[in-house]
Curated annotation (Swiss-Prot):
GO terms for molecular function: metallopeptidase activity; translation initiation factor activity; translation initiation factor binding. Belongs to the eIF-3 subunit F family. SMART domains: JAB_MPN. It is found in: Cytoplasm. The lineage of its organism: Eukaryota, Fungi, Dikarya, Ascomycota, Pezizomycotina. One of its GO terms (biological process) is formation of cytoplasmic translation initiation complex. PANTHER family: EUKARYOTIC TRANSLATION INITIATION FACTOR 3 SUBUNIT F, EUKARYOTIC TRANSLATION INITIATION FACTOR 3 SUBUNIT F-RELATED. Residues 30-166 form the MPN domain. Component of the eukaryotic translation initiation factor 3 (eIF-3) complex. Keywords: Cytoplasm, Initiation factor, Protein biosynthesis. This is Eukaryotic translation initiation factor 3 subunit F. One of its GO terms (cellular component) is eukaryotic 43S preinitiation complex. Component of the eukaryotic translation initiation factor 3 (eIF-3) complex, which is involved in protein synthesis of a specialized repertoire of mRNAs and, together with other initiation factors, stimulates binding of mRNA and methionyl-tRNAi to the 40S ribosome. The eIF-3 complex specifically targets and initiates translation of a subset of mRNAs involved in cell proliferation. Pfam families: JAB, MitMem_reg.
Length: 345
């Protein structure tokens, strides 16, 4: 991912719009969830060969004061674009938006995305649609997220809001001034672990990777930490030996990192770490035991049902046999009675 740039926001006059209908163009911060980026990349991979870019809708949440927007999910919107015109399936966009908002009531429409860093006249038209009244984000600004998907290059992301410009209202409807806003890709520890697992398959010929167990993941994390410590140690030694230029910012960062280290003895750290490992092993053992017990209970219940069915069938057969025997004895008795009557006659 490209590094986040710094932005200076300047207030500018809006275009000629009706009184009381001007959208908000206050500076804001955009937070992007990794699953939204993956959805955009997946849409880009599935595009037609003759399409230079694809577009879609951004969904997420907005803070109460409107200064922070969090992009959580996306969905693709079909469009055709030529050098002269652009056509967007707005009806499909409205129906999909209604379905998503029904499934996720806490999310709202926050903007749209495009898989190209280029901003042109068509971008202004689409931006004005998403930021308009009714089906748009008005009175809040619509966020335009650009994600470059050129093969062989790093993924570069940019976030914009817009302000209408133009001498007349008609010109303002076809134009927009895109204002870059700061953004960040925010993820938790679980998402970071998943991203690292996916990234480990980029150098494999099969483009596949294995899922590590908790112990293996812990071992890899410790190895990475040891590697970073060795790299920092070599850098500090090279600075002391005047083999590398010193960096005040990096030195301050290392000093702050060392200040976070707990003031305890190494023996205490090792003891606590070993206790933690034992706790992890106990929890893993108990989880496996519970899983085994559940599987065994299911198998025993299935076996009892099978045996019960066979016993019921055998008992029913025996009862039918007994009824058949009684019927045979009754028939034999009736035959003997008829023979006696014939003899008396």
């Amino acid at each position: 991912m490209a590094e986040t740039d710094s932005f200076l926001h300047l207030a500018r006059p809006l275009g000629p719009v009706a009184v009381g209908s001007a959208p908000t163009t206050a500076p804001l911060n955009v937070v992007i969830q990794p699953q939204a980026i993956f959805s955009i990349l997946d849409h880009s991979l599935r595009r037609n060969a003759d399409q230079e870019r694809v577009i879609g809708t951004l969904l997420g949440t907005r803070s109460e004061d409107g200064t922070e927007v969090e992009i959580r999910s996306t969905f693709a919107v079909g469009h055709t674009e030529t050098t002269d015109q652009v056509e967007v399936d707005m009806e499909y966009q409205k129906q999909m938006l209604a379905l998503h908002l029904k499934a996720n009531p806490k999310e709202v429409l926050v903007g749209w995305y495009a898989t190209s860093s280029e901003l042109n006249t068509f971008s202004a038209l689409i931006q004005n649609f998403y930021s308009g009244q009714g089906d748009g984000t008005w009175p809040h600004p619509a966020v335009h997220l650009t994600v470059s998907t050129e093969p062989g290059k790093d993924i570069e992301t940019r976030a914009y809001i817009s302000a209408p410009v133009g001498v007349t209202a008609e010109r303002a409807a076809d134009s927009a001034a895109f204002i870059p806003v700061p953004y960040e890709i925010r993820y938790g520890e679980a998402e970071k672990s998943g991203l690292e697992t996916i990234a480990s398959a980029k150098d494999a010929e099969s483009r596949a990777t294995n899922i590590f167990t908790d112990i293996e993941a812990l071992e890899r994390a410790i190895e990475e930490v040891l590697g970073m410590i060795d790299r920092v140690s070599r850098y500090v030694e090279s600075v002391i030996d005047e083999e590398a230029p010193a960096s005040t910012a990096l030195g301050q960062f290392l000093l702050n990192a060392l200040a976070l280290a707990p003031k305890v003895e190494p023996a205490d750290i090792e003891r606590d770490f070993n206790n933690h490992i034992q706790d992890v092993l106990v929890v893993s053992y108990l989880a496996n035991t519970i899983r085994t017990q559940m599987e065994l209970s299911n198998r025993l219940a299935t076996a009892q049902l099978t045996l019960g069915g066979e016993g019921a069938s055998a008992e029913a057969g025996a009862q039918r046999g007994q009824r058949g025997g009684r019927g045979g004895r009754g028939g034999q008795q009736r035959t003997q009675e008829r023979a006696s009557e014939e003899v008396r006659a």
